[in-house]
Amino acid sequence: MKHSSKIIVFVSFLILTIFIGGCGFINKEDSKEAEIKQNFNKTLSMYPTKNLEDFYDKEGYRDEEFDKDDKGTWIINSKMIVEPKGEEMEARGMVLRINRNTRTAKGNFIIKRITENNKGIPDVKDKKYPVKMEHNKIIPTKQIKDKKLKKEIENFKFFVQYGNFKNLKDYKDGEISYNPNVPSYSAQYQLNNYDNNVKQLRKRYDIPTNQAPKLLLKGTGDLKGSSVGYKHLEFTFVENKKENIYFTDSINFNPSRGN
């Protein structure tokens, strides 16, 4: 009887230890998720910024990487990548460098196609069309004979102009990843097709699937803040060996050297 009591006490203690340890692990995961959300919050609070010229007056995170008189450059990038089954991968998007010192914005509309040769080696073909932004309008700086393409470029909208993350706090049960050695961090959430950002993407792009995407928030650099590293968003609709459909977006603030 005495022996049985000892076993019961030991097992009870073991269960309690596992439970407490489990709670600690869960709390740690929740804490890291909250930290990642906090890190992204300042960036995501800029969505939407309908007028791109507002970036001339937006301050970003500054550290010793910036020269004293450098106001910094915002680099925004949006692109849609589609690889249907049995077809080539095509990425269409734009990158714009918004220089706060010169109050000028230049970039490129980029079309990238990736195919594989008989040996399975990727063949990448890029076409870049230089652009500038004036009065919140995208203007090609070189002649484009293809009228349809020219219209696509002139009508292009960055995700920051229509995306909205005011409900970020409502995203729950994310898949959290953190590597302090790089450092890198990410949080991934399953969305549904009723999500406003998903609706906006479907409105603007021909997305050949009804599958709801996952949202990935991914970054590198110190979680407490750094101008070294990057942050980007990814809406992944389909991802496998035969088919890939996803949208990526980023807003980063960097020193203006070379921009």
From Swiss-Prot:
Asked if the keyword Cell wall biogenesis/degradation belongs to this entry, the reply reads no
Signal peptide interval: 1-22
Keyword Oxidoreductase, does the record have it?
no
GO cellular component terms, alphabetically, are: plasma membrane
> Which compartments is it annotated to reside in?
Cell membrane
Q: Where is the lipid attached (N-palmitoyl cysteine)?
A: C23
* Topology class, membrane: Lipid-anchor
Q: What is the lineage of its organism?
A: Bacteria, Bacillati, Bacillota, Bacilli, Bacillales
UniProt record similarity statement: Belongs to the staphylococcal tandem lipoprotein family.
Query: Per its UniProt record, what InterPro entries does this chain match?
Result: Csa, Csa_sf
Keyword line: Cell membrane, Lipoprotein, Membrane, Palmitate, Signal
Q: Where is the lipid attached (S-diacylglycerol cysteine)?
A: C23
PROSITE patterns with a match to the protein in the record: PROKAR_LIPOPROTEIN (PS51257)
Q: Which Pfam families match?
A: DUF576 (PF04507)
The record's annotation in Gene3D superfamilies points to: 2.50.20.40
Superkingdom of the organism of origin: Bacteria
- What name does UniProt use for this protein? Uncharacterized lipoprotein SERP2423
